[in-house]
Amino acid sequence: MRHARGYRRLNRTHEHRKAMFSNMCGSLIEHEQIKTTVPKAKELRPIIEKMITLAKRGDLHARRQAASQLKQDKDVAKLFEVLGPRYAERQGGYVRIMKAGFRYGDMAPMAIIEFVDRDVDAKGAADRARVEAEADAE
């Protein structure tokens, strides 16, 4: 029987899964698009949707709840200052999952998970800023 099987274990312990999804949420918030395996993307979707809902609420308690799940304060700041207002009118469905072929090494099915109305310039912005800062320093 299939009782009490509410999520995928992904061959990881509870602590490892929690840390992995926390890191993936931070990466998705920062870059607004990440490439991962299909099962991880499907498990990440409800987690990040709940984070956006917290950001739409916008109060102090919601900010503290989000900070308890995310590892970096810059991700919490972007979540509440950029993503929350962006999706204020949308009632759910903040992310999409698109199939992206298979990984070369082990043929794992890959997917791209991204925000629906994402900022195209957000992906790689930190790297571009770092390269420009290094160029200015020289």
Curated annotation (Swiss-Prot):
<dbReference type="Pfam" id="PF01196">
    <property type="entry name" value="Ribosomal_L17"/>
</dbReference>
<protein>
    <recommendedName>
        <fullName>Large ribosomal subunit protein bL17</fullName>
    </recommendedName>
</protein>
<dbReference type="InterPro" id="IPR000456">
    <property type="entry name" value="Ribosomal_bL17"/>
</dbReference>
<keyword id="KW-0687">Ribonucleoprotein</keyword>
<dbReference type="GO" id="GO:0003735">
    <property type="term" value="F:structural constituent of ribosome"/>
</dbReference>
<dbReference type="GO" id="GO:0006412">
    <property type="term" value="P:translation"/>
</dbReference>
<keyword id="KW-0689">Ribosomal protein</keyword>
<comment type="similarity">
    <text>Belongs to the bacterial ribosomal protein bL17 family.</text>
</comment>
<comment type="subunit">
    <text>Part of the 50S ribosomal subunit. Contacts protein L32.</text>
</comment>
<dbReference type="InterPro" id="IPR036373">
    <property type="entry name" value="Ribosomal_bL17_sf"/>
</dbReference>
<dbReference type="InterPro" id="IPR047859">
    <property type="entry name" value="Ribosomal_bL17_CS"/>
</dbReference>
<dbReference type="GO" id="GO:0022625">
    <property type="term" value="C:cytosolic large ribosomal subunit"/>
</dbReference>
